[in-house]
C-alpha cells in the first residue's frame, strides 16, 4: 500500500480552476485503480506553513545547542517538523498549481522550504549534495493561460522548472507533468484544452 500526498495550491476549486479540475480527475481515477492506497489532501491555502524567519533560524540554533526555545520559536519549529515528517511518510506526491507571475503561488515555495532539510531530504557529502528521496514519485499538474512549454515565452517559465529542479536535487527519480496551457491565449479552445487535460490526468492515474 502506498501513501499519496495530494498537494493543492489554488484558492478556487475545480469548478473555476483548470488545474484543480485535472487534479480532481486524477485523484478520483487513481483511487479507483489503487483502492488500497492512502490519499491525503493538503490544501496549502488552508494549511499553516511557517516561513523560515528569525524565530525558525534562532530556534534551530537553540535546539542544536540544547537551549530553551521561546513559545513562538517552539511553535514554528514544531510545525515545520510535522510538515516534514508527513512529507517523508509518503511515497508519491501530486502537486496542483496555477502559474502565477511566471511561477506558482508563494505557499508552494513555503512548503518546499519546509521539506528541503539537510539530513532529512538531502545530505552533504564529499561529492557534494545528495538527494535522499530516491524511492519517491512526483506529478505536477499546472495550468497556464498562455503558452510556455515552447516558443518565445518558454524561458520565462519558472514554476514547473523550479519544482522539477528541487525534486531532482532531493533525489526523486520519477517526475511527471500534466501541463494545461493556452486557454487565455485562445479562449475559443478553453473547453477543448480542459477536456484534454482531464483525459490525460485520468490516463496517467491508472499507472502512476
Swiss-Prot record:
Enzyme Commission number: 1.6.5.-, 1.7.1.17
Residue sites binding FMN per the record: 17-19, 99-102, 143-146
Cofactor(s) needed for function: FMN
Cofactor: binding comment: Binds 1 FMN per subunit.
Keywords, sorted A to Z: Flavoprotein, FMN, NAD, Oxidoreductase
Catalytic activity line of the entry: 2 a quinone + NADH + H(+) = 2 a 1,4-benzosemiquinone + NAD(+); N,N-dimethyl-1,4-phenylenediamine + anthranilate + 2 NAD(+) = 2-(4-dimethylaminophenyl)diazenylbenzoate + 2 NADH + 2 H(+)
Signal peptide residues on this chain, from the entry's feature table: none
GO molecular function: electron transfer activity; FMN binding; oxidoreductase activity, acting on NAD(P)H as acceptor; oxidoreductase activity, acting on NAD(P)H, quinone or similar compound as acceptor
Keyword Zinc: no
One Pfam family named in its UniProt record: Flavodoxin_2
Keyword Flavoprotein: yes
Quaternary structure, from the entry: Homodimer.
Family in the record: Belongs to the azoreductase type 1 family.
Functional summary from the UniProt entry: Quinone reductase that provides resistance to thiol-specific stress caused by electrophilic quinones.
Annotated protein name in UniProt: FMN-dependent NADH:quinone oxidoreductase
Source organism of this protein record: Staphylococcus aureus (strain Mu3 / ATCC 700698)
Gene from which this protein is expressed: azoR
Amino acid at each position: 500500500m502506498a501513501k499519496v500526498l495530494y498537494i493543492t495550491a489554488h484558492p478556487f476549486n475545480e469548478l473555476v480552476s483548470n488545474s484543480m479540475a485535472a487534479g480532481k480527475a486524477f485523484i478520483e481515477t487513481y483511487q479507483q485503480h489503487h483502492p488500497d492506497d492512502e490519499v491525503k489532501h493538503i490544501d496549502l491555502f488552508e494549511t499553516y506553513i511557517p516561513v523560515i524567519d528569525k524565530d525558525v533560524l534562532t530556534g534551530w540554533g537553540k535546539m542544536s545547542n540544547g537551549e530553551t526555545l521561546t513559545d513562538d520559536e517552539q511553535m514554528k519549529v514544531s510545525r515545520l517538523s510535522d510538515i516534514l515528517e508527513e512529507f517523508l511518510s509518503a511515497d508519491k506526491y501530486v502537486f496542483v498549481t496555477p502559474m502565477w507571475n511566471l511561477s506558482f503561488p508563494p505557499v508552494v515555495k513555503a512548503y518546499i522550504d519546509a521539506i528541503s532539510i539537510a539530513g532529512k531530504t538531502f545530505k552533504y557529502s564529499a561529492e557534494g549534495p545528495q538527494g535522499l528521496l530516491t524511492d519517491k514519485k512526483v506529478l505536477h499538474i499546472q495550468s497556464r493561460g498562455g503558452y510556455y512549454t515552447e516558443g518565445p515565452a518558454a524561458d520565462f517559465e519558472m514554476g514547473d522548472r523550479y519544482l522539477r529542479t528541487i525534486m531532482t536535487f532531493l533525489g526523486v527519480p520519477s517526475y511527471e507533468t500534466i501541463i494545461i496551457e493556452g486557454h487565455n491565449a485562445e479562449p475559443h479552445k478553453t473547453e477543448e484544452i480542459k477536456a484534454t487535460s482531464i483525459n490525460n490526468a485520468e490516463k496517467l492515474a491508472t499507472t502512476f
